[in-house]
Regions:
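N-terminal "domain-start" segment that seeds a small globular fold
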Residues: 22-45
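Thiol-/selenol-based redox modules, centered on thioredoxin-like
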Residues: 130-133, 137-184
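Sec-dependent signal peptide recognition
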Residues: 3-10
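Conserved helix-turn-beta segment immediately C-terminal to the redox Cys motif
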Residues: 50-51, 60, 65-88, 108-111
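Hydrophobic h-region of N-terminal signal peptides that target proteins for export
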Residues: 12-20
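Thiol-based oxidoreductase modules, predominantly thioredoxin-like and allied folds used
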Residues: 81-98, 114-125
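Short, internal strand/loop/helix patches
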Residues: 28, 101-148
């Protein structure tokens, strides 16, 4: 009886480790690309070796003011190898209804944004853009935005380092500390 229980316990322990494998990364972030707001290809290979913050953005959201912090973060660390990339999405409350041209004008006029902003995309569900599918497949459900201004931090090796929800501001101690650690 004791041996049977011990064997069952060992088998359960062995199988419990099967699902805990490290992300395989069939592709790295730098192998992906997307169109920018002007319709030109934005190849992420140009960011190889840099630390990158991906943010799904929206013009009519309670978190839209985070554009200010994103631009400041970009200006502060871009010369050290840091990039912010904005991904407009209309999936949360219809808060990004504008065309690419309107989004670009809004960002430049209201926030002086000069970091890359992509074509408007889906960031969750079966229609999610390849970038967000890649993040989910390699980092799990915490990489899937629950609302606008969800942040995904990519390390210099092209892998997801961490994610931050909408309530975590771009210039928060948590994000700034992590970026500084990654840049040093």
């Amino acid at each position: 009886m004791f041996n049977k229980s011990l064997i069952t316990y060992i088998i359960i322990i062995m199988f419990s480790f099967l699902g805990k494998t490290e992300a395989k990364y069939e592709k790295l972030f730098f192998e992906l690309s997307i169109k920018n707001l002007d319709g030109k290809e934005l190849n992420f290979s140009q960011f190889k070796g840099k630390t990158i913050l991906l943010v799904n953005v929206a013009s009519k959201c309670g978190f839209t003011s985070q554009y200010t912090g994103l631009q400041l973060l970009y200006e502060t660390y871009r010369d050290k190898g840091f990039v912010v990339i904005g991904f407009p999405s209309n999936q949360f409350g219809g808060q990004e209804p504008g065309t690419n041209s309107e989004i670009k004008d809004f960002c430049e006029t209201n926030f002086n944004i000069d970091f890359p902003i992509t074509d408007k995309i889906a960031v969750k569900g079966s229609d999610a853009n390849e970038v967000y599918k890649w993040a989910k497949n390699n980092f799990g459900s915490s990489a899937v935005p629950k609302w606008n201004f969800h942040k995904i931090l990519i390390n210099r090796d092209g892998k997801v380092e961490d994610t931050y929800g909408s309530f975590v501001k771009p210039m928060s101690k948590k994000i700034v500390k992590k970026i500084e650690e990654m840049l040093n």
